[in-house]
């Protein structure tokens, strides 16, 4: 039933006409999906909120612009929510989806705010198997990922392009599990990227991700149980804005 929905159905769920579609959709992986999306929307020009009660599917999002590019942003937490938004936007006709958010470091030597633009994400998210056959990578579009890396470099932000691991269960990450992921070479862990990549790939859309390092799971520094305060918080707010602007500019190339 829902798999057979067409573009007109997805547009109706978004309460948009085809001519109103954004050039790029940003999916923000974050705990507080509403306030998080609101915060990032403030980095856009003229961002307008689509109230869920005006949309048949109840899908909240903001639409604004940056440097002449029309951008939509939705907050999502975990693979199922990311997949729902990615499927709806891509199904409506959007051609570019970029995952933003944070990752936990699985390798030593990273710093708060370091950025990873992953080549692919390990499919342990719980959703991607519904979109891609076993053995098919949930990977970024190489040209888009490379453009993001270049744009970030122009802003003085260095990046890693190593693969990450997408998990469905953040609080189940024991020290033993973390050590195993690290031994297998994963650069970091998040919850949404594999799902977003899988959906976008299956629906023929360009996709990439740019994630900021929040907690170091090796040294156990900057634990999410403690939160960020003071200068660290101020730094991360500026970094997230710069990364968001860079990925939009890269998508427009």
Task: Mark where each language-model region is.
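Short, basic, glycine/proline-bearing loop/turn elements
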Residues: 67-75, 179-184, 232
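Active-site rim beta-loop-alpha module in soluble metabolic enzymes
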Residues: 137-184
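A C-terminal functional module that forms or caps the active site or interfaces directly
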Residues: 177, 184-216
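Metabolite-binding pocket within alpha/beta catalytic cores that recognizes anionic/polar moieties
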Residues: 1-146
